[in-house]
Amino acid sequence: MSRIGKLPVTLPEKVELSVSPSNLVTVKGPKGTLTQQVDVDIKVSVEDGKVVVARPTEQKRHKALHGLYRSLISNMVQGVSQGYKVELELVGVGYKATATNNILELSLGYSHGIFLKLPSEISASALTEKGKNPIVTLECIDKQLIGQVSAKIRSLRKIEPYKGKGVRFKGEVVRRKAGKTASK
């Protein structure tokens, strides 16, 4: 039995899960609706307010899919009930961020500004306080999508190990390197 797959997913109040005959799992909650196609070999059922994921055999493929789909369904349930939030910190002199509609404008030390069109499912806000680093906050119900977008924003200016400048997740610890020592 998969250690992750055998754990049932508890459905909070106001969250509904339905499975179609074609194994399409739909999760509806107060924040929205998410769908996920599940492999035909994996069985998903709802028992006493808990989602149970089962596999037919002990094959390596089935074991892997068992844990995968249980985690995906768990992420969907958490997304539609609580949502996901990612905060990115822009560390560097002159780094700025503004969010209008679904366009994120970033100044990251390049000779040009960067305009990033965000998917409609993601809401973004930028907070700039005097004397502090700008913070970009992303909110979404889809964990995979918010992770992908935040990784793309982070890759626009990777963290530099000597001074620690760049885009980082809030609270991320950066390994710093010592610079060259001057010889006499």
From Swiss-Prot:
Keywords: Ribonucleoprotein, Ribosomal protein, RNA-binding, rRNA-binding
Bridged cysteine pairs (disulfide): none
Single GO BP term: cytoplasmic translation
SUPFAM superfamilies named among the record's database cross-references: Ribosomal protein L6 (SSF56053)
Keyword GTP-binding assigned: no
GO cellular component, one term: cytosolic large ribosomal subunit
Name of the protein in its database record: Large ribosomal subunit protein uL6
UniProt organism field: Cytophaga hutchinsonii (strain ATCC 33406 / DSM 1761 / CIP 103989 / NBRC 15051 / NCIMB 9469 / D465)
Native organism taxonomy: Bacteria, Pseudomonadati, Bacteroidota, Cytophagia, Cytophagales
Gene giving rise to this polypeptide: rplF
